[in-house]
Amino acid sequence: MPIRDQIIQIVRGHDLTEEQAAEAMEEIMTGVATPAQVAALLTALHLKGETDAEIAGMARVMRAKAIPVHFDGPLLDTCGTGGDSAGTFNISTTAAFIAAGAGATVAKHGNRAMSSVCGSADVLEGLGVTIDLDAAGVARCLEQAGIGFMFAQKFHPAMRFVGPVRREIGIRTIFNALGPLSNPAQARHQTLGVADPALAEKMARALYLLGAQHALVVHGHGGLDELTLSGPNLVIEVRAGHKPRRYEVSAGDLGLTPAPREALLGGDVSTNVAIVRAILSGEERGARRDVALLNAAAALVAADYAADLREGLQQARQSLESGAALARLERLITVSSINR
C-alpha cells in the first residue's frame, strides 16, 4: 500500500497493521516519500495516537536501516524517550557506567540534547569520551571497556530524510518512541524510560513484538522518564515468551530515602559532568547517587545479572564502592580515543 493511501487510512481513524507501518517506514527511509507525505503521516499518527503495532513495524525497519555494530554476547541499553522537561542530570548515562561496573556489557545509544540542556552525547563528550566512533570503534569499546556509545546520527543515515521535516513541524512524533527501540547493536536487554504513562504500555508491547529478551519500561513519579525517589514508579517488565507484567516500586520499598524531584536537578554540560564524576568517584552520597543506584539496579535486572531490584541495588552499590563503575568510564575514555 503506498504511503498516500496509508495517510488516508490514518486520517479516517483506522490503525495501520505492523506490516503496513513497516511499508510506510520503508518509503520514508529510502527517500521515496516526499517531505509533505512524511509530515502528513507523522502528524496524522500523532493526532490518532500511535499503536504498539505501528511503533514496532516502523522500529523494525529503522533497525534494518541502521549501520550495525557487531558484538558476540548479550548487550544492555539504558535510555529514555525524553520529553519530561524535568531538568534532571544524566541519570541513565550514570546508571550505565554503574551497570557496566557490575559486569553488564552496555551498548548505549543516544544523541545530543533535544528537550533538555544536556543529552547523553553531550555529557559523555564533556567527560572526555570520543562520541563519534564508527561501528568498529564502538565494537572495540564494547570488547575492551565493557561499554560503548553509539551516537545516533552517526548510525542512522536514513534519518536524513526525516530530520528536516521533524524540525519544521515542531511536534513530538512517533520518532521520539522509535529512537530507544533502534539500537544499532541490537541490544536485547534494556531499560527504557518514558515520560508519558500511556506510552509506557505501548512501548512495552512494542518491545515484546520486537523480540526483547528482558526489558523494563519505566515511568517515574511526577512524569519523569527515569525511576525516581519522590513516589511510586510504574514498571512494565517484558520477558521473551511472557506477557508484559506491570507493577509499582517506590524508593522507600528498597531502603532508599525518598527525595523530591528538585534534588535530582542538573544543569549545563559542565554541571552534569561534575555530577556524574562525583557519583562515580564516591564523592556524591545523597539523592543523586541514590537515583543512579536505583536506575542501575533496574538495568541489572534487565541484563539478567540481578534477580530483582533489591539484589540489583546491592550489585550497583558494590560497583560504585569498589571503584569499578569509575574504572569503566576511565577505560572508555582511553579506548574510545584510540586511532583518533
From Swiss-Prot:
GO terms for cellular component: cytosol. It catalyses: N-(5-phospho-beta-D-ribosyl)anthranilate + diphosphate = 5-phospho-alpha-D-ribose 1-diphosphate + anthranilate. Mg(2+) 1 binds at residues 92, 226. Pathway: Amino-acid biosynthesis; L-tryptophan biosynthesis; L-tryptophan from chorismate: step 2/5. Anthranilate 2 binds at residue 166. InterPro entries: Anthranilate_Pribosyl_Tfrase (IPR005940), Glycosyl_Trfase_fam3 (IPR000312), Glycosyl_Trfase_fam3_N_dom (IPR017459), Glycosyl_Trfase_fam3_N_dom_sf (IPR036320), Nuc_phospho_transferase (IPR035902). 5-phospho-alpha-D-ribose 1-diphosphate binds at residues 80, 83-84, 88, 90-93, 108-116, 120. It is an enzyme of class 2 (transferase). GO terms for biological process: L-tryptophan biosynthetic process. GO terms for molecular function: anthranilate phosphoribosyltransferase activity; magnesium ion binding. Keywords: Amino-acid biosynthesis, Aromatic amino acid biosynthesis, Glycosyltransferase, Magnesium, Metal-binding, Transferase, Tryptophan biosynthesis. Homodimer. Belongs to the anthranilate phosphoribosyltransferase family. This is Anthranilate phosphoribosyltransferase. It comes from Roseiflexus castenholzii (strain DSM 13941 / HLO8).
